[in-house]
C-alpha cells in the first residue's frame, strides 16, 4: 500500500468514498500509486463523490464548473449545481466561536444576532445580525476546525495531482500546477481579512464603469471593526442565487426575456471590465456567488478567491477577442 494511505484515517475515509461510488481508477491510484488508464465517473456520480468528500473537494468542483476548457458541458452542468451537504454548526458552538473571535462581546455591538445559520457553506456559514445603529449585517463565520481539514485535504490533493501528472490528461492540463494554484487560493480563503480587502477592491473598481450601469451591481460593504481572520462582517443583502431567483421582468413591463437578457449583459460586462480593464477579478464566479436581489439588482458575493492579469496578458486577451469577432484566424 502506498504511503499516501499510511498516515491518516482521513485518507482511508476518502478511499472508502471512492470505493462506495465505484471509482476504481482512483482506488488503484490511491492504493498502488498507479492505475491502468485515466477514468472519470459519470457527471452525477462525480458530483456526489465531491459532495461526500467534503469542503475542499466541493470548492474544487465549484471551480471546475467554471472551466469548460477542462471538462465537457455535461460535467459543467452537473458541477454547477454542486453544494456542500454539510450541516450548520450548532448555535451554542457558533456563539462560543463568535465570542472568541469577535473583537468585542456580541452584546456590545449587536442589537440582536441569530446564532442559527441563515446559510451554511463548505468553508463558512452566515448569520444575520442587527447593529446597535439598526443596520442589518451578514456575519460570515468560519467553520470551527476547518483550517485543519483544509490543510490535510490540500496535502492529499497535491499528492493525487502528482500521481495523475504522469498520465496524458495530467500532462495536458499540468494538474500539479493547477493543484498548487487551487491550494494557495483555498488557503487564502481561510483569512477573512484578505477576503475583506479583495471585496473592497472589487467594490471600488466596479463602482464606476463605462461598460455597465454601476447602480445595477452590488458588491457588499465591509464592516472592518467587526472583521477578523475568522469572522467577516458585511452589509446584509436580500436576494437569492441567480439560478434560483424568480426573474419576472417587473422593471421591463413583465417581459421576462428582456430582463434575463439585461441581466446576462450586465454580468458579461462586469466580468469583462474585471478581466480587460482592472486586471483584478473574482476567480470563483459559480452561480451561487451571484445573487439576484429583491430590488432586481445583481450582487457579487464571496470574493475570497481572486485572480490578477498583467497588462501584457490583457492585451493578448483583447487581440484574441478581436480576432474572434472579426473571424480573423491570422490576427
Which residue ranges define each predicted feature?
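Short acidic/polar mixed-charge low-complexity motifs
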Residues: 133-135, 297
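Short, conserved catalytic or interaction motifs in soluble domains
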Residues: 287, 303, 311
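Conserved beta3 strand of the Hanks-type protein kinase catalytic N-lobe
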Residues: 129-130, 285
Amino acid at each position: 500500500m502506498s504511503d499516501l494511505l499510511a498516515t491518516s484515517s482521513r485518507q482511508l475515509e476518502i478511499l472508502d468514498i471512492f470505493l462506495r461510488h465505484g471509482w476504481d481508477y482512483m482506488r488503484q491510484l490511491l492504493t498502488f500509486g498507479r492505475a491502468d488508464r485515466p477514468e472519470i465517473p459519470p457527471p452525477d456520480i462525480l458530483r456526489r463523490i465531491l459532495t461526500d468528500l467534503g469542503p475542499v473537494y466541493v470548492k474544487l468542483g465549484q471551480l471546475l464548473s467554471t472551466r469548460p476548457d477542462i471538462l465537457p458541458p455535461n460535467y459543467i452542468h452537473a458541477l454547477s449545481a454542486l453544494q456542500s451537504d454539510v450541516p450548520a454548526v450548532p448555535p451554542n458552538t457558533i456563539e462560543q466561536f463568535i465570542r472568541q473571535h469577535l473583537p468585542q462581546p456580541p452584546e456590545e455591538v449587536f442589537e440582536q444576532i441569530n446564532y442559527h445559520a441563515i446559510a451554511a457553506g463548505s468553508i463558512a456559514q452566515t448569520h444575520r445580525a442587527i447593529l446597535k445603529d439598526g443596520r442589518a449585517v451578514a456575519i460570515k463565520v468560519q467553520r470551527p476546525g476547518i483550517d485543519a481539514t483544509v490543510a490535510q485535504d490540500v496535502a492529499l490533493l497535491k499528492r493525487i495531482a502528482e500521481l495523475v501528472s504522469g498520465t496524458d490528461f495530467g500532462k495536458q492540463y499540468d494538474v500539479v500546477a493547477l493543484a498548487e494554484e487551487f491550494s494557495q487560493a483555498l488557503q487564502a480563503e481561510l483569512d477573512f481579512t484578505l477576503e475583506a480587502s479583495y471585496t473592497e477592491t472589487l467594490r471600488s473598481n466596479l463602482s464606476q464603469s463605462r461598460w455597465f450601469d454601476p447602480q445595477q451591481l452590488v458588491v457588499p460593504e465591509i464592516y472592518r471593526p467587526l472583521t477578523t481572520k475568522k469572522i467577516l462582517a458585511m452589509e446584509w443583502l436580500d436576494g437569492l442565487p441567480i439560478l434560483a431567483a424568480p426573474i419576472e421582468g417587473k422593471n421591463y413591463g413583465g417581459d421576462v426575456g428582456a430582463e434575463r437578457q439585461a441581466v446576462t449583459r450586465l454580468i458579461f460586462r462586469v466580468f469583462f471590465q474585471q478581466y480587460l480593464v482592472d486586471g483584478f477579478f473574482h476567480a470563483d464566479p459559480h452561480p451561487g456567488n451571484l445573487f439576484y436581489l429583491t430590488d432586481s439588482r445583481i450582487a457579487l458575493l464571496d470574493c475570497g478567491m481572486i485572480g490578477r492579469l498583467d497588462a501584457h496578458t490583457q492585451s493578448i486577451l483583447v487581440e484574441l477577442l478581436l480576432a474572434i469577432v472579426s473571424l480573423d484566424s491570422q490576427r
